[in-house]
Swiss-Prot record:
It comes from Sodalis glossinidius (strain morsitans). The lineage of its organism: Bacteria, Pseudomonadati, Pseudomonadota, Gammaproteobacteria, Enterobacterales. Keywords: Glycosyltransferase, Transferase. The gene is deoA. It is an enzyme of class 2 (transferase). This is Thymidine phosphorylase. It catalyses: thymidine + phosphate = 2-deoxy-alpha-D-ribose 1-phosphate + thymine. The enzymes which catalyze the reversible phosphorolysis of pyrimidine nucleosides are involved in the degradation of these compounds and in their utilization as carbon and energy sources, or in the rescue of pyrimidine bases for nucleotide synthesis. Pfam families: Glycos_trans_3N (PF02885), Glycos_transf_3 (PF00591), PYNP_C (PF07831).
Length: 443
């Protein structure tokens, strides 16, 4: 028998916690025998004193086990269960293409996704731009869809890692969100509850990332990879660039439109294509569906060019309650903003840098994200035709097209876009799309 306050004291004094102490505390979080104040106190002691790998694994598994864990063995799927998780960014629509692409290559993707958080877009918010599509499925429906279609994307239910919800709510109001052990456990508790054989992490780097610096992102990636593998799930991470909007668009319906056009080969932003292909290739290799990157890319191109990936996306939408002909007629179903106009720069020159976080907050301010939990979202608003780093822009070349609900909203967004994009006389050096591949925790 343990006492929550003694566990807090032990960590406060810099001592490691045992697996049993961690599990006792997390069980108390779940059954409400641990108070919000005690959660806050332990979170702050972890923030200052960190956790070793064994503690991080124990915390993650305890949070996972606070709820239901999916077990795919009885489904006889005939292929590996694999998923991807991104630490979040702006215009990061990869999940909508990646899931169907992996399904078309023989994998099974049970993706539990989230809503937008701060400046970052949320996969669930994007999917809700599709009329009729259900984002909360019961276990039986989720299992059935993964088995039949190969991919399902839904929101976190009350049965999946419920302790995480209570801990995160406390972290959010106690300045402990950016603790690597707590971030790691929060991400992986939900992912491991999916019953995965393998996981690929997309850890963003740059002005629109959770961890803006390469060193911070690398530390987070190493922590996640170390804990996930320690918990029995084969995991690697890619560090990918978020110093500019990843897709050509940012905003819910606008990104869904771009995802469909990507899958049907109508339009593919080169950087979005490269990140998606890199993540998918890693998923196929770690899941045993491809023996090399070349083989993986060949299979993925075939899935796209044959139309199989687009067909899987269409089936996913239809099974989850969306229109059966959505892929063919998406422009008839997606909401359209009242006003769409280009934004031109105040001067001219090469785009030297972007405050990608500010561009994400511009979409939120337009109504495309939530500033309070109860806020409604305008799925139609956002940015399209985003200029890229290194582009030369002038009075005839727009920085972006702003989709807004009113002239006033458009004007505010236009000023925010101009302020977020810095021009110079010389084109900047091109940034890599993928910085690094992380396969093990730091020594």
């Amino acid at each position: 028998m343990f006492l929550a306050q003694e566990i807090i004291r032990k960590k406060r004094d810099g001592e490691p916690l045992s697996d049993e102490e961690i599990r006792f505390f997390i069980n108390g979080v779940y059954d409400n025998t641990v108070s919000e104040g005690q959660i806050a106190a332990l979170a702050m002691t972890i923030f200052f004193h960190d956790m070793d790998l064994q503690e991080r694994v124990a915390l993650t598994l305890a949070m996972r086990d606070s709820g239901h864990t999916l077990d795919w063995r009885r489904e006889a799927l005939g292929g590996p269960v694999v998923d991807k998780h991104s630490t979040g960014g702006v215009g990061d629509v990869t999940s909508l293409m990646l899931g169907p692409m992996i399904a078309a290559c023989g994998g099974f993707v049970p993706m539990v996704s989230g809503r937008g958080l701060g400046h970052t877009g949320g996969t669930l918010d994007k999917l809700e731009a599709i009329p009729g599509l259900a984002i909360f499925l019961d276990d039986d429906a989720f299992r059935s869809q993964v088995k039949q279609v190969g991919v399902a994307i839904m929101g976190q239910t009350h049965s999946l890692a419920p302790a995480d919800k209570r801990i995160y709510a406390t972290r959010d109001i106690t300045a402990t969100v950016d603790s690597i052990p707590l971030i790691t456990a929060s991400i992986l508790a939900k992912k491991l509850a999916e019953g995965l054989d393998a996981l690929v992490m997309d850890v963003k780097v740059g002005s629109g990332a959770l961890m803006p610096t390469l060193a911070g992102s690398e530390a987070l990636a190493q922590a996640i990879v170390g804990v996930a593998n320690g918990a029995g799930c084969r995991t690697i991470a890619l560090l990918t660039d978020m110093n500019q909007v990843l897709a050509s668009s940012a905003g819910n319906a606008l990104e869904v439109r771009e995802a469909v056009r990507f899958l049907t080969n109508d339009e593919r932003n080169p950087r979005l294509f490269e990140v998606t292909m890199a993540l998918c290739s890693e998923m196929l290799m770690i899941a045993g569906l491809a023996h090399s990157e070349d083989a993986a890319r060949t299979a993925l191109v075939r899935a796209l060019d044959s139309g199989e990936a687009a067909e899987r996306f269409g089936r996913m939408v239809a099974v989850q309650g969306g229109p059966a002909d959505f892929v063919q007629r998406y422009d008839l179903y997606l909401p359209v903003a009242t006003l769409s106009k280009p934004v031109f720069p105040a001067g001219e020159g090469y785009i030297r840098s972007m405050d990608t976080r500010a561009l994400g907050m511009t979409v939120v301010a337009l109504g495309g994200g939530r500033q309070r939990a109860r806020d409604a979202i305008d799925y139609s608003v956002g940015l399209t035709e985003m200029a890229r780093l290194g582009d030369y822009v002038d009075a005839n070349t727009p920085l972006a097209v702003v989709h807004a609900a009113s002239e006033e909203s458009w004007a505010r967004a236009a000023e925010a876009v101009r302020a977020a994009i810095q021009l110079g006389d010389v084109a900047p050096q091109a940034l890599p799309v993928v910085y690094r591949r992380i396969t093990a925790a730091a020594d």
